[in-house]
Design a protein with these regions (language model features):
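Conserved helicase motor core of SF1/SF2 NTP-dependent helicases
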Residues: 2-77, 106-111, 116-264, 270-372, ...
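Short glycine-rich substrate-engagement loop in P-loop NTPases that contacts/grips substrate
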Residues: 84-104
């Protein structure tokens, strides 16, 4: 099984705005949409701290363990004749935001760089003892219960120098045209799409399986996933199967196992992954939320018709009362249940066995989750839907399975 193919651009390959952010002597407030290079800039800023002076003790933090692993491994690929240990030293000081909360409130670093800063509450930043640089994007807020909008971050760090990245380096033009059509609330500027004129690419492929929308999958969909992977997989080609929930990830893990396709998998589960993601292979299954910050050559999203059902809120399985489960089975268009102090909102009728995901806190699948998933691919985006989505016909290539 081949590992995830890492490709960190050389610092000389960064654009002038990106290099300016890396080299800014003061702390920075970095912003920009998906694919504009926020994580790359944060990573290079962290590495350069060690290249210029290894005793600086820079600390780079991000929200998910998968992205933390990716960034740490990218550090190891950097070679510098003047400071040969800079890559390894910087790699050792990449961590996740939540697990390093105590450290940054009690240990002083020359600089703490927080990637995906919008995923942390305002309280998280109170009392950090080191200078803070950060990157954030309001359109990628996936945890509205504990987040910080860019305006709030600006108030928290008023002296940080703003650096705005406005060119997409990840996606093709046709993928971004699709994203703009599918997610009007994302407010994607036309300048982003026009800037991709040199990387037109192929239209996302919409495969219609005509399966039961209440079932996790069907034979047509499973076979389509197998065919896509077997056609495209290569040692230097990264493929992801992205899904909303843990149980979906587990299901497709079994599908690939039965089809003899090696893969890695990650979802938030303290029992199975007590230390977070263990590895990333070049065929990887994960949830929308855990995919944020990562990029793949090819992304496959099964059951894409979920886009029409967002937002979906669910609670821990053990908190579900019999009264709630009974009400869930009723055929109604919209259901709002109050369970103890928590609201549960379903955008349309759902069977509880298809939605309940055992977790330690309330889960949500919003349009932002699906938006993040659709902006992960560099080249190919495959969307498999149980039924036709005509409003996307002009920005997809349709295939009937």
């Amino acid at each position: 099984m081949a590992g995830y193919f890492f490709s960190l651009p050389a610092i000389t390959q960064l654009t002038i705005p990106q290099q300016a952010a890396v080299g800014e002597p003061q702390q920075i407030a970095l912003s920009g949409g998906p694919g504009t290079g926020k994580s790359v800039v944060s990573l290079w800023r962290h590495i350069r701290n060690y290249q210029s002076n290894p005793i600086k003790r820079s600390l780079l933090l991000t929200y998910t363990t998968t992205l933390k692993m990716y960034l740490a491994d990218c550090c190891k690929t950097v070679r510098n004749e003047d400071f040969p240990d800079a890559g390894n030293l910087s790699s050792k000081n990449v961590g996740t935001s939540l697990k390093n909360s105590y450290k940054i409130h009690n240990t002083r670093f020359t600089e703490v760089i927080i990637d995906e800063a919008q995923d942390l509450s305002n309280d998280y930043y109170d009392g950090i003892v080191s200078p803070v640089s950060y990157g954030a994007d309001d359109s990628q807020i996936l945890y509205p219960d504990h987040c910080s909008h860019q305006a709030e971050l600006k108030s928290l760090f008023p002296n940080n120098i703003s650096h705005i990245l406005d060119k997409n380096f990840r996606n093709t033009q046709r993928i971004m045209k699709f994203v703009k059509q599918a997610f009007p609330n994302a407010n994607i500027p036309m300048s982003i799409i026009e800037g991709l004129s040199g990387n037109v690419g192929e239209w996302p492929v919409m495969q219609i399986s005509y399966g039961n929308k209440y079932e996790r999958s069907n034979e047509n969909q499973d076979n389509a996933i197998e065919s896509i992977i077997n056609t495209l997989r290569a040692d230097d080609h990264n493929i992801a199967v992205l899904v909303p929930w843990k149980k979906d990830a587990q299901y497709f893990e079994n599908v690939l196992k039965n089809k003899n396709i090696d893969n890695s998998i990650y979802y938030e589960d303290d029992s199975r992954f007590p230390l977070g993601a263990k590895e990333i292979q070049n065929v990887h299954i994960t949830t929308f939320k855990s995919a944020k910050g990562l990029e793949f050559d090819t992304v496959i999203i099964p059951n894409f018709n979920i886009i029409e059902r967002t937002p979906i809120y669910i609670q821990r399985e053990e908190l579900m009362t019999e009264e709630y489960l009974t009400s869930m089975k009723k055929t109604i268009d919209r259901l709002v249940c109050l369970q103890k102090d928590h609201d549960i909102l379903l955008s349309e009728t759902e069977r509880p066995d298809g939605l309940i995901d055992v977790t330690y806190r309330k889960l949500m699948c919003s349009w932002e989750d699906v938006f993040v998933a659709c902006t992960r691919p560099r080249s190919n985006l495959y969307l498999i839907s149980n039924y036709d989505l005509p409003y996307l016909n002009t920005v997809t290539e349709k295939v009937i399975l």
